[in-house]
Amino acid sequence: MVRVTDVPRYVIAADAACAALEGGAVVLHMGTKRYYSLNETGARVWQLLEEGTSERDAAARLVDDYQVDPSEANAAVLQLLAELLAEGLVEARPR
């Protein structure tokens, strides 16, 4: 059984900055000077992370906001988090 304390909390990295654009957002990793683009749903997940929303709650919000299947929303959030984590744009911290 997975305990809540075993699941990391994802937070925006200190050296990541985001600017909203029409239909998405652009994220700058200030350490590497690399830019990344997010589509509309990716930008929504980023916004939710900035608000301190958990990955599970972010997926639930995507279901509400975009009327998508819960398993699809969960998979999309986890995939985005994995990519952001790999690029150093978010950090996984213990709860």
Where are the predicted features?
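Long, low-complexity, charged/polar intrinsically disordered regions in eukaryotic proteins
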Residues: M1-A25
